[in-house]
Amino acid sequence: MKKKFIFTLLVSLVVIFTVYSYKIIYNKKYFMSIVAIMKNEKPYLKEWIEYHRLQGVDHFYLCDNDSTDNTKEYLKSYIDINLITYIHQPGVNQQLKCYQNVVSQYKDETVWLAIIDIDEFLVPIKSKNMKKFLKDFRDVSEVSLHWMNYGDNNLFSRTSNLITETFTSHGKHLNHTVKSIVKPDMVVDFNSFGSNHYVKVCGKSVNEYHKPVSYMLNFNISGDLARINHYILKSFEEFHHKKSRGHPEGTPINYEYYFYHNDNSIKNDTSMLRFLPKLKKYMKKSPLADIDVPRVKFLEGKNFSDFYFSKEEISQILGTPVSDKMLYGEIETLYKKSKIKYKK
């Protein structure tokens, strides 16, 4: 009986240490947090937050860039219990400032800080969750993960299903661009490359295999252990909401942006499949309301044929036959030769 008690006590102590070791070792409130900037993203926040809670995220630092959809009130239940730190971030081109302010003010609160957008989802490929994945990087200051860009799944309008189960078609290859998960107290600056994609740190900056990374464009591309699923467009109708919001860095969001990024080459991706049952349970228990994506009035009664050129039309404009999937050079030539660009 005594041996059983001692064994149970030891197991309990191991569990407690495992769960709270970051507080003991690092003296931090959180092990893993996310910083993101948002503007009128209310229909997407619930799934994004609950999914990342499932991945072991302890806290969210959310910078609100002049939302007009009552985002703060919508998130109040999670702000009140300190799951979310809400930061008002007015003005244009505020993305880097958001990240700089959060790192400056809250660097002593969290061991790891993922710097991503609301349309980006951290995905562990082999680990149980992202928290487990990061446990292997104790002596590292920054982990660079590659994007997998997802297309529109040939959807003109959004269904009622989750983003993570609806959009399963993506490009053939991981993008060479990386996003950073950093130890914020080791950040040197965000301005070295004029981009938020790669953050300069004091200490080791590595990819998933602990190979050195020194730039936002990392051509030693790998996504075997973890990656970022980037739902950059979603449906064609939802793209128009993105277009009206604008890009936080000031990048033009137009039809060129849509057609260039819309790659559905690989079908039926299953990277999110194992998380869906538990995610739906999290969604059901969440205090956040389900918000429908607003309809775009001028799209009513339209379909893809109102916006896409046919191959024959493109060939006529270019003066030469085109490939089934247009090459970037062909698209560029099309823009130069056609004043119409795309049907409206």
Where do the PLM segments sit?
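Cell-envelope/extracellular polymer assembly enzymes that use nucleotide-activated donors
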Residues: 31-33
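Active-site beta-to-alpha loop of glycosyltransferases that engages the nucleotide-sugar donor
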Residues: 36-50, 66
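Short, acidic, metal-binding catalytic loop of nucleotide-sugar glycosyltransferases
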Residues: 50-58
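A conserved acidic beta->alpha catalytic loop
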Residues: 64-74, 91-92
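Conserved donor nucleotide-binding strand/loop of the catalytic core
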Residues: 79-94, 176
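Catalytic-site signature of metal-activated, phosphate-bearing donor transferases
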Residues: 97-100, 124-334, 343
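Active-site nucleotide-sugar/metal-binding loop of Leloir-type enzymes
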Residues: 100-112
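Short beta-strand-to-loop acidic/aromatic patch adjacent to the donor-nucleotide binding site
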Residues: 110-123
